[in-house]
Amino acid sequence: VSSTARGRGDVYKSLTKAALAQALLLLRTALELGYSEGCLNSKSFQSHQKELESFPELISILLNEKSGFMRNLARITSSVQNWIFLGCGIYYPVAMESALKMKEVTYLHAEGMPAGFLKHGTLSMIEESVHSLFFVPPPAEVDLHNRTIIAIEEIKTRGGTLVGLYFEGDSQAKSLLDHAVELPPVPFLIAPFVQMILAQMFAYYTALDLKRNIDKPRNLAKSVTVG
């Protein structure tokens, strides 16, 4: 959130903490259920717990190391009027949340879509002026990674502009993307959350570049009171 939100209390209308907190709570619940039902053994459960406990420190490091890269990416692309955010599997809701934040604070057109469904109409939108932002899973998540790379190649073949967040060691994604930010290796469990936070940062810096009122986006209320 912006300095206004930090300095004067929670006045920010487009909350980044809500989606992240809900997703992490759901993950913690799933881990507890998995352990209690015998789907996870004690060793796996404790390992995942340690990964989650390391998350705040990891995010602090990433924010310090990658904020400059995200700011630079925002400056390069802030004139883009149309965005498609794409991810496979668990990265699809990450794409949805990230597209929502982009449209809320920048007033640009942004849609979150599943990367595996491009041929169901989405490809007709592809042209150089439409930028596609991909959330690329770690290469070790073989199935999700392969499906994401196929989608990237389909858009590249049709002349679309490709932006992406990918993890260190992914030479395949690096060679295909026009603009990209490389992330350090992280546990599979928290990889989607890392990308979500950086995408929220990308929306923030894009809004700053466009001189939007980030704390109070136009036409938005703190809570929705009507159906």
Region locations from a protein language model:
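A SIS-like phosphosugar-recognition module
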Residues: 2-3, 13-227
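A short, hydrophobic C-terminal helix/tail in secreted or cell-surface proteins
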Residues: 6-9
